[in-house]
Amino acid sequence: MTNIRKTHPLLKIVNSSFVDLPAPSSLSSWWNFGSLLGVCLAVQILTGLFLAMHYTSDTATAFNSVTHICRDVNYGWVLRYLHANGASMFFICLYLHVGRGLYYGSYTYSETWNVGILLLFAVMATAFMGYVLPWGQMSFWGATVITNLLSAIPYIGTDLVQWIWGGFSVDKATLTRFFAFHFLLPFVVAALVMVHLLFLHETGSNNPTGIPSDSDMIPFHPYYTIKDILGFLVMLTALSTLVLFSPDLLGDPDNYTPANPLSTPPHIKPEWYFLFAYAILRSIPNKLGGVLALVLSILILAIVPMLHMSKQRSMMFRPLSQCLFWLLVAVLFTLTWIGGQPVEHPYIIIGQMASILYFLIILVLMPLISIVENRLLSW
């Protein structure tokens, strides 16, 4: 008798995706982050659903409703901090997942890569709108500053900003619509994840060597399910430790002050996972130029496949490219640090240098060094 998992219409899909899926035998722990992101998304949707049962999206009561969740709801503080720090975990896994794709040349699967970029934008939009909901000082001023950037768009900018605000400033209408979109977008993300996996399973997974592994495949279950479960345990342990011992470590103290349109915080900054893009935005004195650089800092990922000049797919056997890759990582850490600093000397010039280096490495140095490595191969 044929196993039900291979014949049942629904189980058949699950089976071909998670059980009998042929996977390369050489996948390292860097391939764990896809499944970890799935767990992060599940945690965020579940905790978010329960938080939404107690939250009110009204400027008069939003801040107090979050306080009520933390003080009066059974384990409300756990839900709230799991959700807030779960977002940080989500972005740590996201950036490591993208970094893995860049290092091992996974971007040559262009459909999977492009859907991944869409996912990155969708998750960033969701996180930004979620940060506005507690209606603290940084929520309010962060929303004001970031939405105001759209006014840099020629001709329609000002009208567009007022349309998004639902008035002449960030107010009740803005908060209500941000809550609506923050609730909706994770389900859009979940749908995009399905498309991402669909495209991935069309081609099969890449592997650390970048060499086709059709002749050396193993079933996903039990080998990689066990490996993924270990990843889940490590990540959930780290998340639990953060939530139970230092829940406010990655947050901003200003967000414990209720939003006040008449008082500007000394340093307006977004959450830590947006600081690198915020530093690039601030490093250009022109408003429109800054906005374009901000968008391009993420959108540049879309042209990475076109800039691939190497005869080898992975960086595993390309030491010069590896040096450049880790320089890029160092530049991103520098930008993240600069994004959290005040706009004064020497931070301004460091931010500008790091921003130039960021675009220079991806657009010029990576393709050039790949061409050099190709020449070295033929020696």
UniProtKB/Swiss-Prot annotation:
Name of the featured protein: Cytochrome b
Pfam families: Cytochrom_B_C (PF00032), Cytochrome_B (PF00033)
PROSITE patterns hit by this protein: CYTB_CTER, CYTB_NTER
Cellular compartments annotated: Mitochondrion inner membrane
Family label: Belongs to the cytochrome b family.
Positions with a binding annotation for heme b b562: 83, 182
S-S bonds: none
Entry's Gene Ontology BP terms: mitochondrial electron transport, ubiquinol to cytochrome c
Role according to the record: Component of the ubiquinol-cytochrome c reductase complex (complex III or cytochrome b-c1 complex) that is part of the mitochondrial respiratory chain. The b-c1 complex mediates electron transfer from ubiquinol to cytochrome c. Contributes to the generation of a proton gradient across the mitochondrial membrane that is then used for ATP synthesis.
Organism: Carollia brevicauda (Silky short-tailed bat)
Cofactor mode of binding and number, as noted: Binds 2 heme b groups non-covalently.
PANTHER family to which the protein is assigned, alphabetical: CYTOCHROME B
First-listed, main subcellular location of the protein, grouped into a coarse class: mitochondrion
Oligomer status and interactors: The cytochrome bc1 complex contains 11 subunits: 3 respiratory subunits (MT-CYB, CYC1 and UQCRFS1), 2 core proteins (UQCRC1 and UQCRC2) and 6 low-molecular weight proteins (UQCRH/QCR6, UQCRB/QCR7, UQCRQ/QCR8, UQCR10/QCR9, UQCR11/QCR10 and a cleavage product of UQCRFS1). This cytochrome bc1 complex then forms a dimer.
Chain sites annotated for binding heme b b566: 97, 196
Keyword NADP in record: no
GO cellular component, one term: mitochondrial inner membrane
Membrane topology summary: Multi-pass membrane protein
GO MF annotation terms: metal ion binding; ubiquinol-cytochrome-c reductase activity
Keywords: Electron transport, Heme, Iron, Membrane, Metal-binding, Mitochondrion, Mitochondrion inner membrane, Respiratory chain, Transmembrane, Transmembrane helix, Transport, Ubiquinone
Cofactor(s) annotated in UniProt: heme b
Binding residue positions for a ubiquinone: 201
